[in-house]
C-alpha cells in the first residue's frame, strides 16, 4: 500500500519530467524569464502589447501558471498561423469567463473547434449573415441613423456637449437589437437604452478577467477562485447579462407575438429548433445555443462597432486637415442640401473609405483578436509550438510595425492612396477582423454599420472639442478604445 501511495504522489512529477525531457529537444520560442510554478504571471502588468516583440522577436513564448501562450507580432508569423496552419491553430482555449459568457461554449466565437462549432458556423453563414439578410436590414440601419441625426441636431442648436460613448453605444445597440432580436431598444420594457454601454462593460469584465483556475487547472485553482471570492464576483457580473438575454428569449417565445415576414436572427434559430424536432437531425440546437448566439451578436456586434466609431471621431478631431478633406469629398459628392442620406450614398467616396481603413489599422477593436489554441504540434517561423498552446495574434503591433508602415503611429489615410491592402483577412499586415476559419462572421454587417454611421456624422455635423480641452491629450490607453467622452458639434 505504501509503495502504491508513493507512486501516486510521484506520478505527476514523473509526467512533468518526461514532458520537459520531450520538449527539451524542441526549439521553443524565446520569451521573458519565468519563475517556477507561476511562470510569467508576476510580469503580467509589465508586458504592454507593443513592446513584447522589441526584445524577443515576433514569436514569443509566455507561461501563465501551467498555460503556455505564444504571442505573434509579425505579418509573416501571422500568415503562418492564420493561413498555412489555420486548421492546426483554429481551436479556442476554455477559460472560466468565456465558458460562462458562451453558455458552456454553445456559441460561435468562443467554442472549441469541432463538429458542434462547424454546425454553428454553417448556420451563421447559410442562415444568419447572408447577403439577402444584410440587404433586408438596410432600412433598419438607415432609420436608426436618422434618429441619431435628429437627436444630434437638437444638441447642436444649443451647442450642448455630446457624450460620444453613450451616444454611439446606443446607436449601435439599437441597430443590433432590431436586426438580431427584433425589438426596438427605444421602446423596450426590460432595458433602458442608456444601459447598453454598461452591459457591454460587464461583458468585457467576463471576457478579460482571468480566474486562477484558468492558469492552474484542477482543485488548487478552483479552491483559490472560491476562497478569493472570484467565483461570486463573476456570477454577480454575469447575472445582469443573463437576465437581459433571457428577456430577449422570453420576448421571442411570447404567445401571440407577431413575427415579421423576414424574421430577425433569433427567430431564424428558433424556427430551426422546431424543424429539427420534426426532422430528427443529429445536431440539436438548444436554449443554450440560442443564448450563446444572443451573447455573440450583442456583445461582439455592439462593442466593436461602437468603439471603432469613437476612435474615428477622436482621430478626426485630432487631425483637422483630414477631417476637412474627407468632409469636402462627402459634401461635394453628395451635395450639401440632402435632408437624409442612404447606404447607396456610400458609393464613390474614395477618400472616405481610406479614412475608415486607417481607423481599422490604428485602432483594431480587438487588439489581440480572440485567442486561438493549437490542436497539434506545429512549427511557426522555425519554432516548435506544442499542442494545447494558446496563440494570440498582436494585430495592434503588426499594424504599427515600422517595417510595414511609414510613420506607423501617424493617422494618415493617404498611405492607402496607391495601396491594394484591404482589411478583409487576405492581407496579413491589416487584420482587424481576423482571418481563416475564425474570421469574424459578422464582418460585412460591422463594416457597413461603421461606414454608414460615420458618413452621417461627417455629412451633417462639424466636430470640435469643449473649451479648454486639448486635442493632443484626448487619447490614452494601449490599443483599447477609450477615446473622447465629450465633443461639440455644430
Swiss-Prot record:
Stored InterPro entries: Cyt_P450 (IPR001128), Cyt_P450_CS (IPR017972), Cyt_P450_E_grp-I (IPR002401), Cyt_P450_sf (IPR036396), Cytochrome_P450_71 (IPR050193)
Domain of life: Eukaryota
A cellular component annotation (GO) from this entry: extracellular region
Keyword Oxidoreductase among UniProt keywords: yes
Sample GO molecular function, one term: monooxygenase activity
EC number: 1.14.-.-
Catalytic EC class: oxidoreductase
Stated family: Belongs to the cytochrome P450 family.
Designated name of the protein: Cytochrome P450 71B29
The species this protein was found in: Arabidopsis thaliana (Mouse-ear cress)
Amino acid at each position: 500500500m505504501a509503495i502504491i501511495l508513493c507512486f501516486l504522489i510521484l506520478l505527476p512529477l514523473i509526467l512533468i519530467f518526461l514532458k520537459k525531457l520531450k520538449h527539451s529537444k524542441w526549439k521553443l520560442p524565446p520569451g521573458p524569464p519565468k519563475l517556477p510554478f507561476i511562470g510569467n504571471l508576476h510580469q503580467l502588468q509589465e508586458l504592454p502589447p507593443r513592446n513584447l516583440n522589441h526584445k524577443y522577436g515576433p514569436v514569443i513564448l509566455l507561461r501563465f501558471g501551467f498555460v503556455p501562450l505564444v504571442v505573434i507580432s509579425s505579418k509573416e508569423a501571422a500568415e503562418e498561423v492564420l493561413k498555412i496552419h489555420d486548421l492546426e491553430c483554429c481551436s479556442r482555449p476554455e477559460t472560466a469567463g468565456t465558458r460562462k459568457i458562451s453558455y458552456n461554449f454553445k456559441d460561435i466565437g468562443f467554442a472549441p473547434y469541432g463538429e458542434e462549432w462547424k454546425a454553428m458556423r454553417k448556420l451563421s453563414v447559410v442562415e444568419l449573415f447572408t447577403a439577402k439578410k444584410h440587404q433586408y436590414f438596410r432600412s433598419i440601419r438607415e432609420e436608426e441613423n436618422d434618429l441619431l441625426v435628429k437627436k444630434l441636431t437638437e444638441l447642436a442648436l444649443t451647442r450642448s456637449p455630446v457624450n460620444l460613448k453613450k451616444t454611439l453605444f446606443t446607436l449601435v445597440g439599437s441597430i443590433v437589437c432590431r436586426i438580431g432580436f427584433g425589438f426596438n431598444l427605444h421602446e423596450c420594457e426590460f432595458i433602458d437604452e442608456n444601459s447598453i454601454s454598461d452591459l457591454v462593460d460587464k461583458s468585457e469584465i467576463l471576457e478579460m478577467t482571468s480566474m486562477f483556475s484558468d492558469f492552474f487547472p484542477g482543485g488548487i485553482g478552483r479552491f483559490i477562485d472560491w476562497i478569493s471570492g472570484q467565483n461570486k464576483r463573476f456570477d454577480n457580473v454575469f447575472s445582469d447579462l443573463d437576465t437581459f438575454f433571457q428577456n430577449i428569449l422570453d420576448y421571442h417565445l411570447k404567445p401571440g407575438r407577431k413575427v415579421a415576414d423576414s424574421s430577425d436572427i433569433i427567430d431564424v434559430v428558433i424556427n430551426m429548433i422546431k424543424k429539427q424536432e420534426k426532422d430528427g437531425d443529429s445536431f440539436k440546437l438548444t436554449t443554450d445555443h440560442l443564448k450563446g448566439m444572443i451573447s455573440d451578436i450583442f456583445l461582439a456586434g455592439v462593442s466593436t462597432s461602437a468603439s471603432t466609431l469613437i476612435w474615428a471621431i477622436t482621430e478626426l478631431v485630432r487631425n483637422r486637415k483630414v477631417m476637412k478633406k474627407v468632409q469636402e469629398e462627402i459634401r461635394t459628392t453628395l451635395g450639401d442640401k440632402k435632408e437624409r442620406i442612404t447606404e447607396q450614398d456610400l458609393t464613390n467616396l474614395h477618400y472616405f473609405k481610406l479614412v475608415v481603413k486607417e481607423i481599422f489599422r490604428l485602432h483594431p477593436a480587438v487588439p489581440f483578436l480572440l485567442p486561438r489554441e493549437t490542436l497539434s504540434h506545429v512549427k511557426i517561423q522555425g519554432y516548435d509550438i506544442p499542442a494545447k498552446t494558446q496563440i494570440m495574434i498582436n494585430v495592434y503591433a503588426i499594424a504599427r510595425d515600422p517595417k510595414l508602415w511609414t510613420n506607423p503611429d501617424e493617422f494618415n489615410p493617404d498611405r492607402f492612396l496607391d495601396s491594394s491592402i484591404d482589411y478583409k483577412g487576405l492581407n496579413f499586415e491589416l487584420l482587424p477582423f481576423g482571418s481563416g476559419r475564425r474570421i469574424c462572421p459578422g464582418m460585412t454587417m460591422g463594416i457597413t454599420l461603421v461606414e454608414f454611421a460615420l458618413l452621417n456624422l461627417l455629412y451633417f455635423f462639424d466636430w470640435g472639442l469643449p473649451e479648454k480641452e486639448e486635442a493632443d491629450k484626448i487619447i490614452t490607453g494601449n490599443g483599447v478604445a477609450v477615446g473622447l467622452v465629450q465633443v461639440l458639434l455644430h
